[in-house]
């Protein structure tokens, strides 16, 4: 498989089945999981071994209204510390407020540093996003961040391999976010544990790079640290011309073309999903597997987890997504804040206005995305419809910055996690596609977007 080929290229020492020392081609860092790692280097009198293979950005704590108005003491300390650390250790970075700044899993691909064949790590669980390019990419802990800083290597046990084949043509109103939410709803949040998940099939091949990133992004919610896809012409076209793209691009592509799974590749587990049978997805509970197709009733209580989820969400079995009274809409996050996500959402709000008593925010995932979106007039479409148009950052995906959902309020969110208190204390999160979130903003509740003229 592609994973085997990449793994073999990066092993320095060690036996399969045991921890093996792996070479890291690209290390992304942000302000939350790096301070202690940098301090460890200082205490040991070490340098960052390959600052040229390290890239930093500011995202988790960044306010999206006034990015410099950081009132939380810990948030400010983390941002100030990363500014100091990247300077002291000579690390390239998208400075706070700079023209490149944004969510780490968007900035990496946008700069062209994420490429097929690379072994990529970052102190963030959604690092699997970069696997959409045909790279091994996964999240690591702070002590591992320090190890990579010091050695440009990491100890890792080779995981088992799972193949998830998405086949067929999706119905109108069904998007890549629905593919991954449907997979997780069917098989659970632990199905991928101990495996790298390779996503393949004609339905994946027909997706754009941005749509593919959405699927790989949520591998961790499926239980897998790593998601990967075979690179193809769309991948090469995306990377070409970006600042970090290989200088001898033709030679790089010739190599990348060898980095695909062979027809006879063997997997430990295979799952097939016919996307023509899928529907728009909405989560009802407190983990991403607690989701249903729009129109389906929420399930009966099967265990204590379900009971707790229903109590927290103030919902009950038999209810449907359209019964939820929404108070907030969040379009953003490293899952769905790319240009195509914003274009899709804008289609559903153009010339309309959000429902009364509703707060709706759009947070582009990076400064470049925001810039292009504004050139296209997307900001005006959203603001005319009553949305707030924000600066880039992780924003309302997690309660680490000023963007929080109030206690007890239901939020339609294009992010990746619906845990208790994830978007703020007592916040009730419903994961969905940008199209579902945008349409819900207008109606004040979830609607069947398949019936709307925007999808025809």
From Swiss-Prot:
* Residues that bind [4Fe-4S] cluster: 334, 394, 397
- Molecular function via GO: 3-isopropylmalate dehydratase activity; 4 iron, 4 sulfur cluster binding; metal ion binding
Give the record's keywords alphabetically: 4Fe-4S, Amino-acid biosynthesis, Branched-chain amino acid biosynthesis, Iron, Iron-sulfur, Leucine biosynthesis, Lyase, Metal-binding
Under catalytic activity, the entry for this protein gives: (2R,3S)-3-isopropylmalate = (2S)-2-isopropylmalate
Q: Does the keyword Cell inner membrane apply?
A: no
Supply the EC number(s).
4.2.1.33
Q: Which cofactor does it need?
A: [4Fe-4S] cluster
Pathway membership: Amino-acid biosynthesis; L-leucine biosynthesis; L-leucine from 3-methyl-2-oxobutanoate: step 2/4
- Tagged with keyword Transport: no
Q: Name one GO biological process term.
A: L-leucine biosynthetic process
Q: How, per the record, is the cofactor bound?
A: Binds 1 [4Fe-4S] cluster per subunit.
Its domain of life reads Bacteria
The subunit structure is: Heterodimer of LeuC and LeuD.
* Family membership: Belongs to the aconitase/IPM isomerase family. LeuC type 1 subfamily.
The record's annotation in NCBIfam families points to:
leuC (TIGR00170), PRK05478.1 (NF004016), PRK12466.1 (NF009116)
Q: What does this protein do?
A: Catalyzes the isomerization between 2-isopropylmalate and 3-isopropylmalate, via the formation of 2-isopropylmaleate.
Query: What protein name is recorded for this chain?
Result: 3-isopropylmalate dehydratase large subunit
